């Protein structure tokens, strides 16, 4: 399950 890391430049790829 992908959780978006808000505040990053690429919210589509910056996931945990």
From Swiss-Prot:
Mn(2+) 2 binds at residue 14. It is an enzyme of class 3 (hydrolase). Coiled coil: none annotated. Keywords: Cytoplasm, Hydrolase, Manganese, Metal-binding. Binds 2 manganese ions per subunit. One of its GO terms (cellular component) is cytoplasm. This is Manganese-dependent inorganic pyrophosphatase. The gene is ppaC.
